[in-house]
Amino acid sequence: MNANAQLMNFPIDNVIQLIRKKWVVQIINDLFFGKTRFNEFKENKPKLSNRVLSSCLKDMEDNGLIKRIVDKYDKKNVRYYLTDKGQSLNKIIYEMAIFSVDSENYTDKTKTELKLVFKEKLL
């Protein structure tokens, strides 16, 4: 396959397909910030229903972004973790976060603080 044909099958499309579903980027961000439980992902997301979150987590697991770990002694104790593939999105999430911070009307001090937090958690 020549270079032009490969560009027609744009590699970025694969990444976009992985993260395009609503809530995926927010959940990945939550995982980078240490959240691992179903109800933790719902915090500060009042419009995120249980059904949608379950579907989203299943899709993320099916696509190899997260792994679901069920406690062998307590089947109700379920945690989610980023896989290596999921963790490799750190730079993409970081750049999106920085773009967002720079695009909002934050004070310079707040922008600096937010960028530091994102750098610490994502890079």
What function would you assign to each model-found segment?
Residues 62, 82, 119-122:
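Loop-helix junctions at membrane interfaces
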Residues 72-95:
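Basic, amphipathic "hinge/linker" alpha-helix immediately C-terminal to the N-terminal HTH DNA-binding motif
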Residues 32, 70-72:
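N-terminal secretory/targeting leader peptides
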Residues 1-8, 44, 56, 77, ...:
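Recognition helices and adjacent regulatory flanks at domain boundaries
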